[in-house]
Amino acid sequence: MMYFDWNEEKNKQIKAERNVGFEDFVQAFNDDKILEIIAHFNKEKYPTQKLFIVELNEYIHYVPFVRDNEKYFLKNIIPSRKLHKLYKKDL
């Protein structure tokens, strides 16, 4: 069974800056709130990363991640005005 992992220091930083954390993402994932999984915008710089698109705190965020055979390693949680406009019109 796949599980989620992340850097705890990065999680603290994200919580302080954006008032959302990886635990919030995991809850959204478990509640089937993932809107889409897409390739990373910058495939040259991040060829092994993909992005979860998810609504957290009523705003669309993307969560870069790397997947291996046993886990998803979450890299960041980034609010996106562009994705918010794209996805919120459909929600």
Language-model-detected regions and their locations in the chain:
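Ribonuclease/tRNase effector modules and their secretory precursors
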Residues: M1-L91
